[in-house]
Amino acid sequence: MTSQANPQALIEQLRLLTADPAAYFQDDVQKRDFQKLARQAATAVEEPFETMQRLVYGPLPLVTARIGQDRGIFDALAKSPEGAALDDVAQASGLPKGVLESVLDYLCTQGMALESQPGIYKPTSLTHMLLVPLFNDAVTHFHDNCLPAFYALNNVLDSPEQGKTAFKVGQHSEEDFYTWMETHPVQQGAFHRFMEAQFAALPTWLDVVSFDTEVAADVQPEDVVFVDVGGGNGSQCAALKKLFPSLPGRIILQDRPAVLSKALQVPGMETMAHDFLTEQPIHNARAYYLRQILHNYDDPTCIHILQMHLPALQHNPSSRLYIDDKVLPDAKPPASAPGVEYTAALSLAMKAMFDAQERREKHWRWLLDQAGLEVVEIRRFTRFDDAVVVARRRVQDQWR
């Protein structure tokens, strides 16, 4: 006979944990086990109607968080740690009290605010967190840029029209995401800041590639050691120079002219206008680096992008492609395992925004083979399946 937990004792334990979560867990593994079981328990005890409500109102946390940020609600609460009256929040937000109260009521259910007494609202730790630039930008990006695409996704899944993405349908635009952002500076800024900040505390490809000894050994000053293909503002060039300030050889940042005009000022970094859908003009470089580019494109386009590098790789046996992207494991972990929900959601986001996807290891190997390349090795560097795929021109084709 299996022993049963005392529900009241379990409730008391959860209250204690909620009051001081940092004191409860010995390590991250234990914490992740708890998170997994807590989610499973919450789902298991739901009534069917409660499950339905959770699903159909799923977009509201993001929608109300955007309202809270955009209308100054979170700012007003953060400035009133002892509590702000509904009238005061209404004045700060410019919203009618009726709809504002509905918004605040929902924010309270999500822990984004607290009604300490009738009509008095206080900030919570989540209120303050949502005012941090990283989270502010994340909410703006996913609400303004992605949410319309998510809504349109089902309508385009079986669309035969080439280039018709859920993003274009959701935004009522004929422009792709990156072109569209050029005329939407608020959303563009939020996206780029979020993309840079979300990875700031995580390991990077340079934690698993000893660039100075593996890539740059015997490099001469006139040699090209690093080409950052579609490298945006040059943050990876900056990271490389910061780690190896005396690195010999040339470092080249490639992107569209409009992007290069906003690039970081990195000592020793050259800039070059280049469309990676055309042939790579720099030959014989040691490293051609593509960071989070290929997951924005379907297989035929990825194969084309990769093939555009074949001539550049032809004559230097030390030339390599370094593809910094998600590499999902071929053997799927349990759906409740840490990070699985995130990577599954990200793959759907790629489908909605670009008609693309995240790829498993066997998919990457097939893709590179189709392009005339071979995988040298794959090195993973985060628990979210971030990896660097090191590839070269197929040996039998190397000097054709």
Which residues make up each language-model segment?
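Short, flexible/disordered secondary-structure transition segments
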Residues: 27, 52, 164, 202-205
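Alpha-helical subdomain
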Residues: 2-104, 115, 215-400
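Single, functionally critical "micro-switch" positions that shape active/binding sites
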Residues: 123, 200, 255
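Short, exposed beta-strand "edge-strand" segments with a Pro/Gly-rich flavor and a Y/T-containing core
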Residues: 116-123, 168-177, 203-215, 290-297, ...
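Short, Φ-rich (hydrophobic/aromatic) sequence segments
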Residues: 139, 153, 189-199, 203-206, ...
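Loop-centered beta-sheet repeat module
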Residues: 184-239
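N-terminal auxiliary segments of SAM/dcSAM-dependent transferases
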Residues: 5-45, 98-197
